[in-house]
Amino acid sequence: MEGGALAFGHGRMKAFSVRGRGKVKRRGPAGGRSSLHTRDGGERCPLRRTGKYGKGKDMLFSASRRTDIPTYYSEWLCNRLEAGNVCVRHDARRVTRYVFSREAVDCLVLWTKNPLPLLDRLALLRGWPCVFQFTLTGYRRDVEPGLPDKLQLVEAMKRLSEAFGSERVIWRYDPIFFSGAYSLSWHVRCFDALTERLEGVTRTCVVSFLDMYPKLRRRIPALGLCGDSGQARKGLLAA
């Protein structure tokens, strides 16, 4: 699988990934006409109405683990959908243009903590094979200061489920960490409360624990986090 990261705005932020075995690459002199080629063959690759870049070459657009595009760039995303193409900046000189159309894309995966800015534009997404990776926890504003009230987000998830189906809305309860304010028992109570509100809204829930990278470990005293506790993890998963 080939991958890429999209640069948009002024080219300083990378926020988009494109995955597929038939990576489409723009070639040609600057200012001249360019044609679309596949990296693995170098031959012109016509788009098929099956949504494939050639036989067996699925195209997945994932937007994105690097930033919350539905929250901050929903207008940009919809503009790209209407334009039918998107440019990917790999470095200062190299830019790849991808076809961004319903016929070419097999799945559009949107990662978000707050889809509210996108809800008024859902009509543009109808007909697209969308999957939403929706992160929703009970952390308060000391951890997630930029989010709306959690009950608003529950209602937003319900709207996505009604529009696209419960199987296309994946609930992510992550990352899980433990501190004085967020204990094992707190997570159990919070998770139970959310599952009651989200009954029938989603069919899948993903949980994961905070990765304790060296840089984060140095900040643990300031953040008030407890050390990585295998016992606490087992207790939460067994609850």
Predicted segments, located by residue:
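Serine residues within intrinsically disordered or low-complexity segments
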Residues: 17, 34-35
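Conserved Radical SAM active-site core
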Residues: 37-144, 150-166
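Surface-exposed cleft-lining segments at the edges of enzyme active sites
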Residues: 140-147, 175-185, 221-233
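Extreme N-terminal basic, low-complexity initiation segments
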Residues: 2-8
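A conserved mid-domain beta-alpha-beta active-site/ligand-binding segment of alpha/beta enzyme cores
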Residues: 233-239
